[in-house]
Amino acid sequence: MAPQGRLLIRGGRIVNDDFSQVADVLVEDGVVRALGRDLLPPEDASRGLRILDAAGKLVLPGGIDTHTHMQFPFMGSQSVDDFYQGTKAALAGGTTMIIDFAIPQKGSSLIEAFETWRNWADPKVCCDYSLHVAVTWWSDKVKEEMKTLARDKGVNSFKMFMAYKGLYMVQDEQLYAAFSQCKEIGAIAQVHAENGDLIAEGAKKMLALGITGPEGHELCRPEAVEAEATLRAITIASAVNCPLYVVHVMSKSAAKVVADARRAGNVVYGEPIAAGLGTDGRQYWSEEWSHAAHHVMGPPLRPDPLTPGFLMDLLANGDLTTTGSDNCTFNTCQKALGKDDFTKIPNGVNGVEDRMSVIWEKGVHSGKMDENRFVAVTSTNAAKIFNLYPKKGRIAVGSDADIVIWDPEATRRISAKTHHQAVNFNIFEGMVCHGVPLVTISRGRVVYEAGVFNVTAGHGKFIPRQPFAEYIYKRIKQRDQTCTPVPVKRAPYKGEVTTLKARETKEDDTAGTRMQGHS
């Protein structure tokens, strides 16, 4: 095989978020060097050059999965897709970058969590990656560490949990403080939007009713619980003019809240995930416990069968913006930790490998979106929001050569028997998808071709992300200038002012306060 690093992709239809064109792509040293019709390589590059025929195929920017949890210690277990297996599977699906989450325990250092995840990922990743960092508690130390992470460590996104009471959940005043700091340091705030107090009470109620199976998971976390928290997060973010990113939007109700806020001018982005776009929560009522448990995730899939189509509609029309997978996989034996109590089932599903094909099938093949919108929601919008653009999320001169040769007419049947993930089931089992990645190129190297990998652990790199992403902060800065309240200019009051008598007792003070309140 010719040495990697010099590639000429011939005759494909290059698809970016804003236009498509038939052209060749010349890649050298991991970067796109030239685009054009009937492109001839430089004479000194002709030797050792590999030519890939993409005639009749699409040439796409590699996918960016905005939401993964590889080898995540959670609910007494650890997700089985580690940073090697998970990123290898991502490449097979046409994804060339993931953004995972470093999540500290309450009271623990954010920076130490970040370094822990870096140490786990750096030697293993097969594709490029970055890290969001979670804020699970609040103090002056947390505030300072957020600043350090944004300034020195390449982190420009911080996630707050409104659920998982007693574990990761933060209160409204902590959300306000964290959002305020995000704005100060030029980061984007992310939220897991569910009302954790209502979930905790609902879970007790379900168990008291004898509902111990996976259906209890959805019953104690209904749509209203997600929608309420989504609106609350948007309200708090708006109060401090902080950009907000709502992860895993799972219900019609929550999606409507995001859509309404965007149409009202709020700087907010919604992220549906492959699971919510490709299947629904009727699975929780399966009489086969393991099948039902395989689908347990938070927020849950919704039993309304119209939900996936509704979310795809909003993704297609711009009310929702990006797509992730929330890939957090636990094998059946791990899910069985909750065989007698649904609250103990580790939350999480697969999706990092199948995200691109599921969205093509449900979005493009169905006629809801075109190829350009597909690129926007699977790659470009994420690159813009998280300040990776145009190095990522675009095929242009100077961009990283993260490229997928995509066959829009080919089909594949999703199955745990053939997928490349470590988990022993697949929530999309049996789904036939149009849209198949034939070749995946990461950092200028062909890493996956015709079902064969050519990649080793550590090929991928950590990609730092700078704060104050122009795509989101242009509007934030303008809103600061035009929407910040100002005092009314008026002449000073010069009339009589009543003199209050001194109060001698606490009771008099209280009574006086009441009287003043009614004056």
Swiss-Prot record:
UniProt modified residues of type N6-carboxylysine: K159
Keywords, ordered alphabetically: Hydrolase, Metal-binding, Phosphoprotein, Zinc
Pfam families: Amidohydro_1
Annotated positions binding Zn(2+) 1: H67, H69, K159, D326
One GO CC term, this protein: cytosol
Modified residues (Phosphothreonine): T510
Any single GO BP term: dTMP catabolic process
Domain of life: Eukaryota
Catalytic activity, EC: 3.5.2.2
Co-factor note (free text): Binds 2 Zn(2+) ions per subunit.
UniProt modified residues of type Phosphoserine: S79
Binding residue positions for substrate: Y164, N347
PTM (free text): Carboxylation allows a single lysine to coordinate two zinc ions.
Modification sites for N6-succinyllysine: K256
Catalysed reaction, written as an equation: 5,6-dihydrouracil + H2O = 3-(carbamoylamino)propanoate + H(+)
CDD domains: D-HYD
Protein function: Catalyzes the second step of the reductive pyrimidine degradation, the reversible hydrolytic ring opening of dihydropyrimidines. Can catalyze the ring opening of 5,6-dihydrouracil to N-carbamyl-alanine and of 5,6-dihydrothymine to N-carbamyl-amino isobutyrate.
Oligomer status and interactors: Homotetramer.
Stated name of the protein: Dihydropyrimidinase
Cofactor(s) needed for function: Zn(2+)
Amino acids binding Zn(2+) 2: K159, H192, H248
Organism (species): Mus musculus
